[in-house]
C-alpha cells in the first residue's frame, strides 16, 4: 500500500496548444504546407475536456499555450463569437485554465481587451513580484507585460511569460514598445512582407514572432533567483519556443539567446513549454532543461488528437500524450548540472 502511494504524482496538469478555432472551411496554412481544420479544432477541444474530466487523478489546472482562436475570424468580425464558443467548452471542465497569449490573440484583440477578458488568468497567480498588466491604481498599463507565476504544490512553480512584449502586433501604435519593436524588426528584416523570412540570417525576425523586453528579463531573473533560493523546480511557459532544436528556427522568440541565457543560469529551471510551431518538437539542452513544443490542435487531422497530461513526481515529469503528442519521461536536471552556473 505504501509503495502504491509512493507512485502517485504530486499533481497533474493538462496541456493544449494552438486551437485556433474559426467557423470556417478547412484551408492551407500561411506557407501552404499543411491543412488547417478550423471547425474541427472545437471538436478536438471538446474531446480533450471530456478526457481530462474522466481522468482518475483530476488535473490541478490546464495550460492553454496560446492562439486560442484564429486571426481569420477578423475577416467577418466573428472574433468575440469564436472566443465565446471556445470558452463555453472550457467552462464545462471545473478546473482552472492558465492562458498565455500568442500572435493570434493579438490579430483578434487589443492588449487592453485581452487584459479585461477571461484570457487574462493573472489573478490565478501569486501576487508577489508579478509581471502585471495594470498600474498601481488598477488601470490598464499598455507598457506592462502579461506574465505571472504560481505554485500548485510546494517546491514547484510555473512561470508564464509574454513572448509579444516587444512586438508590432502585440502593442498599440501609440506605445513606445511598438516603435522599438518595429524598428528592430525592420533592421533585421528588409522584406516588404515582414512575415517572410526570405534571405534572413536570423529567420526568427518575422512579424508573427516577438521579443522579451529587458524589463521582463529582469523580472524573470528576480523570480528565478527566488526559486533557486527556495530549491523549487520551475516550468517556464510561453507561446513562443526559445531553443533552436525544439522548433523551426522561424518560430523562435526574437532574442531567444538572451532568454536561454537567463534560463540556463538558474538551476531551478527544469522545463520550458511552448506552442506556435504546430508540428511539435522536443529537445533537452546541455544544461538539462527540457524544451517541449506542443503539436497544434489546428493542424491535427480529425482522426487524431493533440493534447496531453503531465504527471509530476519528485524526480521527473511523465507526459501522457494523445494522438500527435508523444509520451515522454522527463527527468529533472542532474544535481551536478544544477550546481553549474551559465
From Swiss-Prot:
It catalyses: CDP-choline + H2O = phosphocholine + CMP + 2 H(+); ADP-D-ribose + H2O = D-ribose 5-phosphate + AMP + 2 H(+); CDP-glycerol + H2O = sn-glycerol 3-phosphate + CMP + 2 H(+). The keyword Metal-binding applies. Its cofactor is Mg(2+). PANTHER family: MANGANESE-DEPENDENT ADP-RIBOSE_CDP-ALCOHOL DIPHOSPHATASE (PTHR16509:SF9), PTHR16509. GO terms for molecular function: ADP-ribose diphosphatase activity; CDP-glycerol diphosphatase activity; metal ion binding. It is an enzyme of class 3 (hydrolase). The keyword Coiled coil does not apply. It comes from the Eukaryota. Belongs to the ADPRibase-Mn family. Keywords: Hydrolase, Metal-binding, Zinc. Monomer. It comes from Xenopus tropicalis. The gene is adprm. Zn(2+) 1 binds at residues 18, 20, 67, 278. Zn(2+) 2 binds at residues 67, 103, 239, 276. CDD domains: MPP_Nbla03831. Its EC number is 3.6.1.13, 3.6.1.16, 3.6.1.53. This is Manganese-dependent ADP-ribose/CDP-alcohol diphosphatase. It holds the Pfam family Metallophos. Hydrolyzes ADP-ribose, IDP-ribose, CDP-glycerol, CDP-choline and CDP-ethanolamine, but not other non-reducing ADP-sugars or CDP-glucose.
